[in-house]
């Protein structure tokens, strides 16, 4: 949505949206590299010492790529988390607000959340840990940006319908849907879109 409204350029360096990342590797890693997991080898998860909001930016500042941006795809929550974080920066809102107050309502999703509100917790699915105790996605650095939204079955159907037939959506949302349907990076017969 940020790209469709002209607030985010997928080709721009990541450092354009977060000056603290400027003067180094993120001047050569694009927003698109982050959105397609081709930033240069960010790990699957943040290391424990950086898995919090206080240390995540310094982690990115100190991180060293394993390969050139755009040359290899490696799934990474920090990579997609930074993509979401910079997208929110471009919209000048926290990601939760950008999603829950702007984008999700434009898609007609009334029971979809980045952070499930207390009034909906009884409907929020859970898994079980090795100890048999209930578990859900835990908090961590860029969790809202990387771990996805929580939705109801009826909203999931609305989301699928919006993606199959976006003609009823406002024009910026139609463009956003189209951007997410575009393949940007191909490897081993698979084409990667955003996220």
Model region roles, listed by residue range:
Residues 9-24, 107:
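Short, glycine/proline-biased beta-turn/loop segments that scaffold the active-site neighborhood
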